[in-house]
Amino acid sequence: MRRRFLLAAALALLPAAAAGQARDCELVRANNARRIQTPTSEVWFISGPADFVCSDGTEVRADSAVLHKGVSLELIGRVFYADSARTLEAERAVYYMASARLHAQENVVLTDRQNHGSVIRSQSLTHERAQPDRPEARTIASGRPRPHATLYPRSSTDAAPGDTAAQPFEVDADWMEIRGESRFNATGNVAIARGETRSGSQRASFDEADERLVLSDDAWVEQEDLRLQARTIEAVLSGEQLRLVTAVDEAHLEGRELMVDAATIRLEFQDGALQRLIAVVPPPPAPSAGGETALERPRAVALARDLRLVADSIDALAPGQTLREIIAAGDAFAQRQADSLSAGLPELIANDWVSGDTINAYFVLAEEATDSVAAAVDPAAPPRPDSAAGAAPDSAEVVLERLIVTGPGGRAQALYRASRDGNDPGPPAINYTIADRITLVLSGGEVKEAEATGDVRGRYLEPQGRSARPTSETESTRTQRPPTTGSR
């Protein structure tokens, strides 16, 4: 009974299924057990293999063990611990009784039996049991090679076999910590993978109760053809799928159809697919004589295909993960990239551009744009076999179809070029318009239709050698000169 009592006091290694419940443990196999007692200590040397079994089902095995009564229990060689909640394997382990702390070394493997088999592998692992003065248990993994964790969210245990929702988080880091039953922290070149999603940072934390993952310091996330990076990225899950991702401080996104830079970028998902992007910057300071200009203050910038937009906020709508609309608000400016019509033109008129309070850019699948043109030519013609109806959303290309710029009080402006008719290789005509609202319809990369409402003014300029079209503008070209692209 003496030996059984002493071992029972020592074998509280990890939090068992019934924490705090009394455990009676017995040495069931050992080659030799020798006791050395002094006036100040009592030590048991157990040569093995040493096997212990406890009344609650806990099992402990090691090649040998050293018990310092009331101080520590050291397990040496092929250490194995198992209770109903988890198992631990290591080459060496020491349990310190007063602090209720376990330290395991060399080839440590900690497996959670109750959570779909979550596993932590490391060269060094320290576990501190919950105590009256320490309400939460704490596990720390470190060492070289770096720790690796395979973590299954608890809700994934209800997923069907083979369901992608049951995919674990694969985590590598220099240092890992688990607090309680739901909080995970990692530092030092953190790399996280789950299915096709990859992410990384210098620091990471995951709160399973709140379903929230926070990546800090050089954070990045990749998913299929999408990459997001910032100082800090926070992801909110809904069950096992992404619901909301927010990137803060020097946020940058690169996608197949869109590239965005802003102080903050927020991505909204539905059923795991990106539906909406919102990019914002801090509000501009109050106007002053020496205040910042639109060029100097932080702006949100988006590049969608060949269209560059600059504004205080940018809202991109992508239902089904296909770009359909971008709304640029707040001193907005949009410019199309250089094309064949730009050759030989001054910078001021080399590219089509619009500016105003708000710009709405609408996109369609390239096949839809082609079919709409074909339908206009021959309404009775059947749709092409490879039209948008049969194209995969993730492989179809989108093109700019329409621009609407608004700015009451004549703050809407547009400058666009019109190519010559026929085979005339000369420079294009230039159309500059000021109004309250301007709509441009594009086809084949060129403006085909334009509509302006409100107090409409402007200029239509043709190169020398072309017949000038009469205009109704009352102001001179000098007074109606458009702003330079550098001011936006």
What are these regions (language model features)?
Residues G20-R488:
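N-terminal amphipathic/hydrophobic interface segments
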Residues A9-G20:
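Hydrophobic h-region of N-terminal signal peptides that target proteins for export
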Residues M1-L7:
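Bacterial N-terminal signal peptides that target proteins for export
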